[in-house]
């Protein structure tokens, strides 16, 4: 797409920042849970640049849920790539709003009990009725799903570059080490 010379990425202080040394574009580190809101601010001062927030599910749907929701309501023209590993990975693998029923985590060693911890949050279900430019959920589980996910990310950036508004792509991803 030829965006790397212009792209500005905002990352969270959690797991998402661990790969920025391999990126070939400029990055900004935001406070925990605030990359999407920070990306909105960056886009307002640099409207000519493509702007992406790269954030985990815990930060986007827990500590940063207000920012995620407000950006969707406002339909601000930024891309959010949310890596959903179904737990709080950076702090040791605890149960998160996205943890699945029965999923074992460090804080739910017998598995998540929905009666005690609630059902997993699903962003596509929650935001499907909102007037945003693009919303999708992909998986990084095998080559076929990775290729589908790449197409989702491409479509989000195409809509973003056309100025259509908020684009959120959630990518289901394992966290085998619970960093």
Predicted regions and their residues:
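Glycine-rich ThDP/TPP pyrophosphate-binding loop and its adjacent helix/strand module
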Residues: 63-74, 78, 83, 87-179
